[in-house]
Amino acid sequence: MAELVPFAVPIESDKTLLVWELSSGPTAEALHHSLFTAFSQFGLLYSVRVFPNAAVAHPGFYAVIKFYSARAARRAQKACDRKQLFQKSPVKVRLGTRHKAVQHQALALNSSRCQELANYYFGFNGWSKRIIKLQELSDLEERENEDSMVPLPKQSLKFFCALEVMLPSYDCRSPGVGLVEKPVDKVEEGPLSFLMKRKTAQKLAIQKALSDAFQKLLIVVLESGKIAVEYRPSEDIIDVRCEEELHGLIQVHCSPWKQCGQEEEEYLSDFSLEEEEFRLPELD
């Protein structure tokens, strides 16, 4: 049976491994490295998190490991359960099991994670991106020419990007758009700080557009190990081919909106599998 791997933060229990009976000798950082090395042999890992045992338990650690692929997680569980791996005593490995009903909305991967996932399944040369439009929508210059006695409203840098991700081997193209708005005060911050913020906003717009393009792609892993791609366009997606077609698209996406930074995304994605949602299975 084929497995579908979306460009989304893995939150499913069948993609999560619980590892315990970890020795108290090494540090948490050393255990993180050893776990990553051991389990990454079975598939691409999203995260490895190491926790100290509860005070009422014996000294040691346990870990929560997330895979992008449920199939890879199952292989790792079967191969590593009750094995010594990197320590003298065997570890115990189980697939995650939620003990209460918890609903989570899937979070999109940021651009760095998307590229990591694409490189793993398609190869470094198996995909590319093409920027169609990168436009600054700020109105800072106009505001500077206004009467200096009139209080200026809060100014901001705003960049729009439209691009497409191309997969030549699969004859597939996926468009994406991104809009970033960052508050700025050119007088207080100075020219150097303003230029740095401008460069950062421009880069973030490209990253958001890249992530948006990947969200419309679904990796299909066949039983034979071969890879296919499914393109799933949203109803409101416009296939932009030329600059003229971008005008309406820009107008639609220019409304103010609260944005979640990459650091916030990583925090929220890990929060979805906090330790209270899972229990360690009782073993005979």
From Swiss-Prot:
Swiss-Prot/TrEMBL keywords: Cytoplasm, DNA-binding, Nucleus, RNA-binding
InterPro entries: Nucleotide-bd_a/b_plait_sf (IPR012677), Rad52_fam (IPR041247), RBD_domain_sf (IPR035979), RDM1 (IPR040224), RDM1_RRM (IPR034200), RRM_dom (IPR000504)
Gene Ontology MF, one: RNA binding
Keyword Nuclease: no
Pfam families: Rad52_Rad22, RRM_1
Localisation: Nucleus; Cytoplasm; Nucleus, Nucleolus; Nucleus, Cajal body
Chief location bin: nucleus
Ranges of residues in domain RRM: 15-98
Biological-process GO terms, alphabetical: DNA repair
CC per GO annotation: Cajal body; cytosol; nucleolus; PML body
CDD domains: RRM_RDM1 (cd12364)
Ranges where the record places region Necessary for nuclear localization and for nucleolar accumulation in response to heat shock: 1-92
Location of region: Necessary for nuclear and nucleolar localization: 90-133
Protein origin, superkingdom: Eukaryota
Function: May confer resistance to the antitumor agent cisplatin. Binds to DNA and RNA.
Subunit-structure text: Homodimer.
Record remark on domains: C-terminal half contains cytoplasmic retention domains as well as determinants involved in its stress-induced nucleolar accumulation.
Designated name of the protein: RAD52 motif-containing protein 1
Organism field: Macaca fascicularis
